[in-house]
Amino acid sequence: MESLAALYKNHIVTLQERTRDVLARFQMDALLIHSGELVNVFLDDHPYPFKVNPQFKAWVPVTQVPNCWLLVDGVNKPKLWFYLPVDYWHNVEPLPTSFWTEEIDVIALPKADGIGSQLPAARGNIGYIGPVPERALGLGIAADKINPKGVIDYLHYYRAYKTDYELACMREAQKSAVNGHRAAYEAFQSGMSEFDINQAYLTATGHRDTDVPYSNIVALNEHASVLHYTKLDHRAPAEMRSFLLDAGAEYNGYAADLTRTWAAHGDNDFAHLIKDVNDEQLALISTMKAGTSYIDYHIQFHQRIAKLLRKHQLVTDMSEEAMVENDLTGPFMPHGIGHPLGLQVHDVAGFMQDDTGTHLAAPSKYPYLRCTRIIEPRMVLTIEPGIYFIESLLAPWREGPFSKHFNWQKIDAMKPFGGIRIEDNVVIHENSIENMTRDLKLA
C-alpha cells in the first residue's frame, strides 16, 4: 500500500481541484478556513471541549488546535497559520512536522488576533468558512462571502466521494473501534456496569470521552430501546440480559461508527433474533451496488424486518407485504438504514442530488432516513438495521384493527432486552462493496 504521505499528496491535489472549480463558479479569489475558537461556559472561565470545523480538518489532520487558519486558492501551496502561543497555563501543541507538512506551508501564529496582519490586504473577494462570522467581519471579509451557501453546498456534495487518503484514515479508525468493541464485550461478560464498560472501551481505543466522534451508546437490557442512550449507569443491573454498544473512533479527523448487540445467554429467543438481524444485515449488504438509490435499501430492509417479525411470531396472520404496506414494521425499526460517514459521523450532503445543493427529502413514510442519494464509488455509508421494543411506538398499535396481528405476549417478553442494532461501515466500489468492519473480523 502507498504511504500515507503519498496518499495525502494526492488528496491535496483533489482538494485543490475542487477549490479551483468552486472559486471559478462563484468568481472568488480564495477561501479562508478557520479551525474555530474555544467557547467558554456561560458565566465561567472554563471552555467547552473544542470541536474543529470539519471543512478545516478536510485539509489537515489538526483536530485539537483552535485559532488556526487555512488560506487556499486551488493554485498555490495551501497556507496554514498554526496557533502557537507562549502559554504556561495550557498545553501548547508544537509546530507540526509530519507526513502531511510537505504539502502545506505551515506558519506559526503566536497571537490569536494576529491573523489580520498575515492575510492579503485585499480581502473583499475571499470567502470565509468557519464558525465565527464576527471574526470574519472584523478581518474585512464581505458579509455575503461568509459561509456562502453555494460554496458550502459544492464542497459538501463532493465530500461524499472519499479520496484514497480518506479511505485509509477510515480503515484505521475502524481498527480502533473494533478494538474497543472487543474490550467492551469482555467487560460486559464480566458483569461490569455501563460506566465501567465505557471506560474499558475508551482505554482500548486510546480515546477520551471528548475524543470519540459521538457520545458512546452503552446500553444494558431495556436501555437498548432508547436509540441514543448516553446515561451510563454506575451500577450493573441485577440481571444481565442484553448489551447494545454503538461506539466509534477517530483517526486524523475521520470517524468510524459501529454497533453490535449481544445476548447474555445464547439460547433464548432474543439471541436467535440477534443472529437473524445480523444475517439479514449481511444479506442486504451483499445486494448493494453502485448506481442504486440508498432509499431502495432502506425499503428493502423493511421487507426483511417483516420476514423476521413473521419468523419469530411477533406479528402473525399477515403477509410480509401487508406488514410493510401498513407500516407494521415501522415501530420496530423507527430509524433509517444508515447514513453517510466521513469527517462527521452523520456526514454532510446525504440529501444532495447535485453540486448545486438540490435537496431530495426522505420519503414521508420514513422521515428519519438520513440519505437519499444514488450510491456511487468512493462513498462510505453505514448499514445499521435494528429491531426494537419501544413502548411509546408500540402503544398506538395496541388499539385498532391491526392490534390482533401483534403477538403482544411475545413482544412484552422481549421488552426487557430493549432492542437490537447491527452496524457496519461500507465503502462503495465500482464492482464491489468493501465492508471495513467485517474485514476486521468483528462478528
Curated annotation (Swiss-Prot):
Q: Name one GO biological process term.
A: proteolysis
Give the record's GO CC terms: cytosol
What does this protein need as cofactor?
Mn(2+)
Write down the chemical reaction(s) this protein catalyses. Xaa-L-Pro dipeptide + H2O = an L-alpha-amino acid + L-proline
Report if keyword Hydrolase is assigned: yes
Kindly indicate where the leader peptide sits in this chain. Answer: none
* Enzyme class, spelled out: hydrolase
Binding-site residues, Mn(2+) 1? D257, H339, E384, E423
Q: How is the cofactor bound?
A: Binds 2 manganese ions per subunit.
Swiss-Prot/TrEMBL keywords: Dipeptidase, Hydrolase, Manganese, Metal-binding, Metalloprotease, Protease
Residues recorded as binding Mn(2+) 2, renumbered to this chain, are D246, D257, E423
Which Enzyme Commission number(s) are listed? 3.4.13.9
| Organism domain of life | Bacteria
Regarding protein family, the annotation reads: Belongs to the peptidase M24B family. Bacterial-type prolidase subfamily.
Q: Which HAMAP family match?
A: X_Pro_dipeptid
Q: What does this protein do?
A: Splits dipeptides with a prolyl residue in the C-terminal position.
Q: What is this protein called?
A: Xaa-Pro dipeptidase
